[in-house]
Swiss-Prot record:
InterPro entries: Elong-fact-P_C, NA-bd_OB-fold, Rib_uL2_dom2, Transl_elong_fac_P/YeiP, Transl_elong_KOW-like, Transl_elong_P/YeiP_cen, Transl_elong_P/YeiP_CS, Transl_elongation_fac_P. GO terms for cellular component: cytoplasm. The gene is efp. Belongs to the elongation factor P family. GO terms for molecular function: translation elongation factor activity. One of its GO terms (biological process) is peptide biosynthetic process. This is Elongation factor P. Gene3D superfamilies: 2.30.30.30, Nucleic acid-binding proteins. The lineage of its organism: Bacteria, Pseudomonadati, Pseudomonadota, Alphaproteobacteria, Hyphomicrobiales. Its main location: cytoplasm.
Length: 187
């Protein structure tokens, strides 16, 4: 579907220069001299490169509609991650580098959303939060709690994050999967 350059909003996926790009930030600019334009920060969905582009109001771009399907994570096989379509029960195999650092947060039976373009996977979204157990946490040094400080900890999946001083090994905590940061203790 074609849209004008001034209608591009953050989150829109467009076809530009032969690739698929997601709009990260947009800024409508109305200079004193010349026509208005939309300054858009784009991120390539395939390789992650960023690009700043100006779109005049009169320009048209192709807005791409991505299909989103729910898949269940089944298991890890070497460098591949195996998922199952929740509706058709077909299996989908993705490489670990496709998921990136967040692959460590995948748990058996976890539901993820895979974005498809012409039946080809181009993106994956994990749940925003996961609950994990702290495997190792450094002890708190007395007198170090006067200022807000964090200490390093290792989670059960091997990921290192910073946690507040009161968190100790064996506790379950909630972690943000996008920022890979501590959120709170688990209930």
């Amino acid at each position: 579907m074609k849209i004008n350059g001034n209608e591009i909003r953050p989150g829109n996926v467009i076809e530009h220069n032969g690739g698929l790009w997601v709009a990260v930030k947009t800024n409508a600019v109305k200079p004193g001299k010349g026509g208005a334009y939309n300054q858009v920060e784009l991120k390539n969905l395939i390789d992650g490169t960023k690009l700043n582009e100006r779109f005049r109001s009169a320009e048209t771009v192709e807005k791409v509609r991505l299909e989103q399907k729910d898949f269940t994570f089944l298991y890890e096989q070497g460098d591949a991650l195996v998922f199952m379509d929740s509706e058709t029960y077909e299996q989908l195999e993705l490489q670990k580098d496709f998921v990136g650092d967040r692959a460590a947060f995948l748990q058996d039976g976890m539901t993820v959303t895979v974005e498809l373009y012409q039946e080809k996977p181009i993106g994956i979204s994990l749940p925003p939060q996961v609950t994990l157990q702290v495997a190792e946490a450094d002890p708190v040094v007395k007198g170090q709690t006067a200022a807000s400080s964090y200490k390093p900890a290792v989670l059960e999946n091997g990921v290192r994050i910073l946690v507040p001083p009161f968190v100790s090994a064996g506790e379950r905590i909630v972690v943000d999967t996008d920022e890979i940061t501590y959120l709170r203790r688990a209930d």
